[in-house]
UniProtKB/Swiss-Prot annotation:
Originating species: Myxococcus xanthus (strain DK1622)
One annotated Gene Ontology cellular component of this protein: bacterial nucleoid
Family: Belongs to the YbaB/EbfC family.
Gene Ontology molecular function: any one: DNA binding
Entry-linked HAMAP family: DNA_YbaB_EbfC
Protein name per UniProt: Nucleoid-associated protein MXAN_1931
């Protein structure tokens, strides 16, 4: 197409990719927290969906009912990962202008 500078678009795409990758590195240092069972299980994840810590209140531990604790841990982990995903999507949308870039955003 006459008048279209493809090199310009490629440079812009590369800059956008660099900004997104830089922001992802920053997100790795950020934390989100989720709780389950009235706060008896707390999970902290970073901004790139890695679990950083799991804390379990003593009251949540019942040797006769391990399935309840398993359910609380599962719920808290899933909530932390969902919160982390949403946080990452919001932050990357700020950079990409809301455009979904496969494999990046």
């Amino acid at each position: 197409m006459p008048g279209v500078d493809l090199n310009y678009f490629i440079r812009q795409a590369n800059k956008l990719t660099e900004k997104i990758e830089e922001r992802k590195q920053q997100l790795a240092e950020e934390s989100v927290e989720a709780k389950a069972g009235d706060g008896r299980v707390t999970v902290v994840a970073n901004g790139i969906q890695e679990i950083r810590s799991i804390k379990i209140d003593k009251e949540a531990i019942d040797p006769n009912d391990t399935s309840m604790l398993e359910d609380l841990i599962t719920a808290a982990v899933n909530a932390a990962l969902a919160s982390s995903r949403q946080h990452m999507q919001r932050e990357l949308a700020k950079i990409s202008g809301g455009v979904k870039i496969p494999g990046i955003t």
